[in-house]
Amino acid sequence: MSGMPKSSKMLQYINYRMRVTIQDGRVIVGRFLAFDKHMNVVICDAEEFRRIRQKGKEDREEKRTLGMILIRGETVVSMSVEAPPPEEAKLAATSKMPPQIPGGPGIGRAVGRGMPMGGMGMGGSGPMSGLTGPVRGVGGPAPHSMMPGGGVPPPMGRGGFPPQGFPPGGPSPQGAFNNNPNNNNGGPPQGFPPGGPIGRGGFPPQGFPPGGPMGGPNLNNGNMPPQGFPPGGPMGRGGFPPQGFPPGGPNFNNMPPQGFPPGGPMGRGGFQRK
């Protein structure tokens, strides 16, 4: 409708059902949508009616559905009103706002990822609205992964931190004795020194030599004596003799000890002194 004055009489027939007759005798009936100064016409829901003449018979009319078509103004012979516009077309023409579609159960909201209108210089107790992260369930990880404490803590004694209320270091070494039924972490009960009972592989309390008390079992395979004893252990067990004693322990190979002539005492089967 470009170039047409607003006071044109053709404007009042918009959305009417019109009958357009063209030069070849066909009649187009449809809803009148638009026109221009050249009288080019746009028709929707168009139906074509053609009259066919037969010799010796009456003329018959043939109908064909076309849909939306554009009719050139140079072929238009006449136009007439066929029917008034439908009810929905009247409501759309009279109302200023288009008919609104009723909303569903959900509510669409914009995801806040931009900076707030007040800028970064605005003071406030909480974080700015543009820096709060994505809305839960939209553009981010799953909600359960954002909750604190979601991971499984590492087991005690393997490099992880102990739970709250437990001493650091995890359970005591293997072999420590636990006679406290309420103590389930393998450590010594309250009131006992660390390392478990004496002589079971733990560290001795302060003031005692390592390896257990005197007379207790030596757990180092007899190689090193406890603190305060000469090296070598008891004589005759394969260790080094104390200072002032010959090495080797008792003589079992018919050799006299150091400082005695070879052969041993006379009269016992040894070698006699020359």
Curated annotation (Swiss-Prot):
Residues 5-85 form the Sm domain. Its main location: cytoplasm. It comes from the Eukaryota. GO terms for biological process: mRNA splicing, via spliceosome. SMART domains: Sm (SM00651). Residues 265-274 have a biased composition (Gly residues). Sequence repeats lie at residues 162-171, 188-197, 204-213, 225-234, 241-250, 256-265. Keywords: Cytoplasm, mRNA processing, mRNA splicing, Nucleus, Repeat, Ribonucleoprotein, RNA-binding, Spliceosome. Residues 148-274 are annotated as: Disordered. Residues 162-265 are annotated as: 6 X 10 AA repeats of P-P-Q-G-F-P-P-G-G-P. It is found in: Cytoplasm, Cytosol; Nucleus. GO terms for cellular component: catalytic step 2 spliceosome; cytoplasm; cytosol; U1 snRNP; U2 snRNP; U2-type prespliceosome; U4 snRNP; U4/U6 x U5 tri-snRNP complex. Residues 173-187, 216-226 have a biased composition (Low complexity). GO terms for molecular function: RNA binding; snRNP binding. Belongs to the snRNP SmB/SmN family. Plays a role in pre-mRNA splicing as a core component of the spliceosomal U1, U2, U4 and U5 small nuclear ribonucleoproteins (snRNPs), the building blocks of the spliceosome. This is Small nuclear ribonucleoprotein-associated protein B. It comes from Dictyostelium discoideum. The gene is snrpb.
